[in-house]
């Protein structure tokens, strides 16, 4: 798991370095965030209705879910919602590849939807325009999350509104550069998602085996490590 996390960190540095090279931070602003994607909020079904929540339904993400993981990709949080729960509120289903951005409590958690998901009202997420792509939006938010957070800092309860999020200024990327970055970033994002999945599977296996090893239910005292080493050599 440690090796996978280190590799993922290296890939993240590589991705952001390429972004910084193609899209310099000192470029003149030529548009706003709503020019490159659709800003989407979220909502919460009534907590008083147990039938609105389930363990295997529509992925529904809260800022707390992002605070509990270091993963870049997310498809499910602590709670899923049912079709009935989804229909009961104004939450919107975000397509795979949307970029989630927490807009309060706190401002600035970022993740990529690994599948279609909904969120609570603590997000102002971005559905990228096809010609812009997920990678550009993700990297832009990573590099500008503090600037965006400052926009909501003047309120009594720090929050970035939908209007604020839409108005975030940026340099509209040239199509040729967007295509180049998307071509470069695509394999990196796929590898990062695969590494995160592998880490979760290894963690689940560890958590399942460790209690059995500690209790003696599984006995490894008679395992011949010399034979194991000869197979690995």
Predicted feature residues:
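Glycine-anchored helix-breaking recognition loops at helix->coil/strand junctions
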Residues: 8, 104-107, 115-124, 140-197
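Low-complexity, Lys/Gly-biased intrinsically disordered segments
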Residues: 27-72, 85-90, 153
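A short beta-sheet element
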Residues: 62-63, 78-144, 151-153, 161-162
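Hydrophobic pocket-lining residues within nucleotide cofactor-binding pockets
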Residues: 66, 165, 214
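Amphipathic heptad-repeat alpha-helical coiled-coil/stalk segments that mediate oligomerization
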Residues: 219-233
